[in-house]
Amino acid sequence: MQNHSLLQKYDKIITESKPILEQYDLCDYCLGRFFIKKTSFLSVKKLGRKIRNSINAKDTVQCYICKDIFSFSDFYVKMMLDASDKYQFSTILVGTILKQSITERDDKIRSEFCLRGVDSIKTLVTRELEKKFTKITHGVIDHLSPDITLTINFKTEHCDVKTRHLFLYGRYTKSKRGLSQKQKSCEDCYGRGCLFCDNHGIVSFDSVEGKVSKVLYKKFQTEHVKFTWMGGEDKESLVLGNGRPFFAKLISPKKSDVLLPKKSHQDEIVIHDLRKIDHIPKGTIPFKSKITLLIETKNKITSEKLKELKHLDGIPIIVTDERGIRHKKIIHSLKYKKESARSFFVILEADGGLPIKRFVEGTSVDPSICKILDTECSCRQFDIDQILP
C-alpha cells in the first residue's frame, strides 16, 4: 500500500514536471528542488536527474533560473576557504547574496506553476555551499551563534567574513603618572575604523586603552576593540591595589582560542586576570573606590577645622550632571592627615562614579570639601588605592 502511494506521488511529480520542462530549460538542481519535499529523496540533484530520465527530457544547455550556478560551486567553496584561512572556528554560518535576476526568475516559475512550499534558489545555493564547506573543514552549522559567518556575494564575486564578537574581563594597575586612561580617536574616522588607522579607530598607543588594545590586537588578531571601564582616573593618577576592572569587546577577531597570561607587563601598566567571558554586564555595575587625595587650600587650614570633614562620613553626596540629573553617592569612610598649613591628605572610600575633583572644588556637587571647610580647595592629585565590589 505504501509503495503504491509513493508511485502515485511520483507519477504526479512526472505529470507536473512535463509542462515546466517544455517551457524552460532547468538544471537537475532546480528541477529536483521543486519536488523534493514530496519524496524521500535526500539529493535534489539525483531527484532532478531521475525526473529528467523518466520523461526522456534532454539535458539543459543552460539553466533558465540559476544560469548553472551549481556548476561553479567548487569555485565558490575555494573562495570561502581562502577567505577563512586565517580564522579559528568550529561552528559556521553561510549566507549568500544572489543577483536579483536569478531570484526573479525563480519566483516567476514558482508562481506560474503554483509550486507552493518549495525552497527558494537562495536556500538551495546556501545549503549546497554549506555541505561542501563543512565536509572540507569539519565545521558544524550553527544558526544562532556561529564562530564565523561567511557570505558569498554573487554580484561582486566576493566572500565577506565576520566572526563572533569576543568579550573579555580584566584589571589594570598603573605605576607611573602621566598616562591617560582613554586613547584619542583617529581624526580621520572619529574612532569608527578606517584605512589610515588599520580599522583600529585609534592611531597612537600611549594610554591605558592603547596599551591594552595593542596586546589584544596581537593575540586575537582583531581589528577593533571597544572598552567598558569601571570608573576612571586622572592622567596623573596611579591605580594601585588589585587594579581597575574593565571589559573589552573584540570585533570580528581572527583567533579565539588564545592562552591568556594571568599577568602581563606593558610599560607603565600591568594587565591582571585577563579572561574570556560570555557577555558584558548590562547597565551600571556598582562598585566602591578607595582613594587618596592631596588637597591644597587658598587659606591656611587648622587641624581643628579639618575635623569638620568627618561630617562627610556616611552622608549622601548629590552630584548633578550636565543634563541636570541628580545622582546620589555615599562616602563610606573618610580619614585625613595634615601635610602643611595649606595642604592635607584625605583617604576616603566612596561609591564609584563620584567625580573627585568636583567633590573637592564644589562644582555641581553638594556637600563638598570646599563647602565644609569654607575655603577654596583644589585637588593637586589623587590615586586609586583599591576598587571594591
Task: Map each language-model feature to its residues.
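Non-catalytic RNA-recognition surface used by pseudouridine synthases
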Residues: 2-389
